[in-house]
Design a protein with these regions (language model features):
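Metal-dependent catalytic core segments for phosphate chemistry
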Residues: 227-249, 575, 582-617, 695-699
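Nucleic-acid-processing active sites and adjacent nucleic-acid-binding tracks
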Residues: 238-267, 404
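Conserved catalytic core of nucleic-acid polymerases
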Residues: 344, 394-401, 422, 450, ...
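C-terminal polymerase-core module
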Residues: 420, 424-427, 431, 435, ...
């Protein structure tokens, strides 16, 4: 039945349909099903003519699939022009009514392969309106009503136009289609075989057996993604393709025997998590430095990151991309939703299969990724992987284990203040809304069955009614009836209610993130352990989450959240910070002589910029503007943002930016050149060897991509400078039987622990005696300063500052040359105070007698609570 004939009999008759029937051909190899046609397509009797289908054909040609009309038939789930509303689900009715017509087209076309583009087309084909489509992408499915056709759901290319980083994932899905279309099937990954080691004797025999192999790949299955709750289920160790030993829970204590094998190179996929779980459960031995032994020489997640920083790095994606393996996780995950300590036996067979396949695929992936990395032209990638990325991954695992000690009483006090502040703002909101809030009218106009007597800003429905229906406001940014922060901030009218709602949301977010969030993540030894990631940002900058300890505000809301982070008794917190690291890298990379001269002569950059922009008699406020320009321009900050921050006109902000470019002309040339590479499709490379590739460039993303390209070289170089400094190899250590790394040396010589990395600074726990504090500050500063010179012969000098504090919220400047504290008051006047006098006045000795600290120390001395005793449990 043609589209026109179907539309005439369709009871839906809501949307514009075709006036002339479309021809449905006989026999095409590939049938592509979109969601619905557009009004323009119905008028011109065409379909699938937009930019999204052009992108689809471009991708199909790239992987070697046909796109000609004699091979490919383009169809739609719905043959009328259904309006697509952002944030709204595609309506069910037309999909249901049009399904019969679609199935008849399939019977006539008799395709070998059917591609469904996005969610609506899959729903139209299958009638499944509860599908989680992202779990289906790349899956191979068969349905009786599709005959012999293979059905493969893929991303809608229109989504990729808005999120071009997904283009490579999309290509991977099409690579699978190409293999099936060409009859080659999946790559020969083989059939995984595994042996379960059920006794200690079998484990010891396996250990002896592994002494003949050079490498293994391993994977750990647990009961939770939260390392604090995760319990060991099974450990898989792959020693040959398709050959895996599986260590069950009952033999978990034998893992140490395998980890002690020094002939093996161990490869994991994101092994940092596995390491943390094994440590948390007491399943590793310790070396002479007190660090636990967890062999982690290679990691496929980081190998892929240096090859492609913009794509996904999960094991499922990588196995499809590099091994052409069929997707398996979307099937297996269904069995793992309820794996707990008590359901271990129920899911044991599935756990063994999962861990064996993951270890086997990791083993095969390592080989495939090594081939990619060793291709001609990739020498810089090998260099940065071996010199920075892998050593940094192991180092960050240690930083995570160190954790940051948290005083919960500080957060509890702040929580009380936050609750009061939120209640006060809520009262102001109710008062401001009272003249407009009409409960009965709201229920009548919205169809709500009930409503509160007072306006509730936390109700999305009440908020949208108040903004759009009652106050009839017209935000410059509109997302349907959304009242998110971007929408409310774009309201030009001066409405007190809107400002109060924004304030309430901001304060509530602070309370949830920085008070409740940190308390929730606090471990039983009193510390929070963030998750640092090297592979999340395309710019190469380190990121942190759960909690984000790089983004703890110095002062926010009701007080300084950083005050809750404290050192253990007898130690002090030391923060050593690069001064203007990114701008110094900018001077070096751009070669701008004016900027280089300022740093070489040791002049204050912000004062010098203020002179160039405002003359020699600049004010403190103008110096702050100069500082904002200095840091903002490399990040692509625009004139409007500067104007809004300082309450000046856009014209003034534009003149300031133009004057900055005039003062540092080679910086402008360099930034423009970086932005141009994104448009030209070229990659950028840092002196360290990292690359930033543009990927798919679309009109929607080009501006943001150009800003990323401007910032990438300086941001990545700055981040790696700090990381490398801390992981660099020093002299040979007799105890370790290898060269000791700097963070290990700090621990061994001074008992110093690295507890946080904040972009360009490092936070340390240091013994509080003056001699140690001075020595550590000098040593760390010296090493940080020398790195750019030693590695890159950088003529721009780098500078560091040291701050000390009894907690992270009260750090003050320390001069490691004089041994004096340099205390600055609110008028920016500096007073020198002897360190000994200062430490006596600020150190919180009473804190270490409080119950929370006594409990933490008690746990550290007797860490049994970390390890769950499962002796006598079923299956043991």
């Amino acid at each position: 039945m043609g589209a026109c004939e179907h539309c005439k009999t369709c009871p839906c008759k809501i949307y514009q349909g075709y006036k002339q029937p479309l021809e449905v051909p006989d026999h095409r190899d590939i049938m592509i099903i979109g969601d619905s046609v557009t009004p323009l397509e119905t008028m011109h009797n065409t379909h699938m003519t937009g930019t999204a289908i052009k992108l689809l054909f471009q991708a199909m040609e790239q992987v070697g699939l046909p796109t000609s009309e004699d091979k490919v038939y383009l169809a739609n789930a719905v043959m009328c022009a259904v309006p697509k509303k952002k944030g709204k689900a595609f309506p069910k009715e037309p999909l249901i009514e049009c399904r019969g017509r679609l199935l008849k087209e399939i019977q006539k076309v008799k395709p070998k392969i059917i591609l469904t583009l996005g969610k609506a087309s899959y729903q139209g084909l299958t009638g499944d309106f509860n599908v989680k489509i992202t779990a289906k992408y790349g899956a191979i499915e068969h349905f009786d009503y599709c005959g012999d056709a293979i059905v493969i759901p893929v991303m809608h290319p229109a989504l990729i136009m808005r999120a071009p980083n997904d283009y490579k994932v999309f290509l991977t899905e099409l690579h699978l289609v190409k293999q099936l279309y060409g009859g080659s099937g999946s790559n020969d990954t083989g059939i995984t075989e595994w042996q379960i080691l059920k006794t200690e004797q079998e484990c010891l025999q396996a250990v002896e057996f592994l002494k003949q192999f050079p490498r293994v790949a391993a994977d750990l299955e647990t009961t939770s993604l939260d390392y604090r709750e995760a319990e060991f289920c099974v450990l898989g160790i792959c020693f040959q393709k398709n050959k895996v030993f599986v260590l069950p829970r009952e033999m978990q204590h034998m893992a140490k025997k395998f980890f002690a094998l020094d002939n093996l190179r161990w490869t994991w996929h994101h092994g940092k998590y596995d390491r943390k779980v094994m440590w948390r459960r007491g399943l590793t031995d310790y070396n002479v430095e007190g660090e636990h032994i967890f062999p982690h020489q290679n990691d496929t997640i980081y190998m892929h990151y240096v090859l492609d920083e913009t794509s996904a790095h999960d094991l499922g994606y990588l196995t499809k991309t590099f091994l052409q393996a069929e997707e398996y996780k979307y099937k297996m995950n269904q069995e793992f939703k309820n794996v707990t300590h008590d359901t271990y036996e129920q899911y044991f067979d599935a756990l063994c299969e999962r861990v064996a396949v993951d270890a086997d695929y990791t083993f095969q992936l390592e080989e495939a990724l090594e081939k990619e990395m060793n291709k001609p032209g990739n020498e810089s990638l090998v260099k940065v992987y071996n010199m920075v990325i892998m050593p940094a991954a192991r180092f960050l695992a240690q930083v995570e284990q160190n954790g940051m000690l948290v005083d919960p009483t500080i957060l509890e006090e702040m929580g009380i203040k936050y609750k009061k502040l939120l209640a006060d703002i809520q009262s102001e909101i109710e008062e401001a809304a009272a003249p407009y809030w009409d409960k009965e009218r709201y229920m009548q106009e919205t169809g709500a069955k009930s409503a509160s007597d007072k306006f509730k800003p936390s109700s999305p429905k009440q908020m949208s009614w108040m903004i759009f229906d009652r106050l009839k406001l017209k935000p410059r940014r509109r997302k349907g009836r959304s009242t998110d922060a971007d929408v409310l901030k774009s309201i030009d009218e001066d409405i007190p209610l809107v400002k109060l709602v924004l304030q309430h949301r901001g304060v509530n977010k602070e309370y949830s993130t920085y008070v409740k969030g940190i308390l929730k993540k606090r471990d039983i030894d009193g510390r929070v352990r963030s998750n640092f990631s090297l592979h999340i940002t395309a710019t190469g900058r380190l990121s942190s989450k759960e909690p984000n300890v790089q983004n703890i505000p110095a002062s926010k809301g009701v007080g300084n959240v950083r005050r809750c982070f404290v050192p253990p008794k007898g130690k002090i917190l030391m923060e050593v910070d690069y001064s203007g690291a990114e701008l110094r890298w900018m001077a070096f990379l751009s070669g701008d002589k004016n900027l280089k001269e300022i740093f070489i002569q040791g002049r204050n950059l912000h004062k010098e910029t203020a002179k160039k922009l405002f003359g020699p008699d600049f004010t403190p406020a103008q110096k702050m503007r100069a500082k904002a320009i200095n840091f903002g321009i490399p990040y692509g900050r625009e004139a409007k943002s500067i104007a809004d921050e300082f309450a000046i006109s856009i014209e003034e902000a534009e003149k300031m930016m133009a004057d900055w470019y005039g003062a540092y002309p080679d910086c402008k040339k360099y930034l423009d050149w970086c932005a141009e590479q994104a448009v030209l499709g070229n990659y950028l490379q840092t002196p360290w060897g990292n690359r930033r590739r543009p990927g798919l460039v679309t009109p929607d993303t080009i501006a943001g991509l150009q800003n990323e390209f401007k910032n990438f070289p300086i941001q990545c170089s700055s981040s790696h400078t700090l990381l490398y400094t801390l992981i660099q190899e020093l002299d040979y250590d007799e105890d370790l039987r290898r060269n000791i790394r700097m963070f290990e040396y700090l621990k061994k010589k001074w008992d110093v622990a690295v507890v946080d990395l904040i972009h360009d600074s490092v936070l340390l726990e240091v013994p509080m005696d003056k001699e140690t504090v001075t020595a550590v500050s000098r040593y760390v500063s010296e090493k940080m300063i020398e790195t750019p010179v030693k590695l890159f012969n950088c003529e721009v000098p780098f500078k560091t500052d040291t701050d000390l504090g009894p907690d992270w919220g009260n750090v003050q400047a320390f001069n490691n040359e004089t041994g004096m504290m340099e205390l600055e008051n609110e008028h920016h006047e500096v007073t020198e105070v002897p360190y000994e006098e200062w430490i006596e006045s600020v150190y919180h000795y009473d804190n270490y007698n409080q119950p929370w600290y006594v409990d933490a120390v008690s746990f550290q001395q007797h860490p049994e609570p970390f390890v769950r005793d499962i002796s006598g449990e079923p299956g043991c």
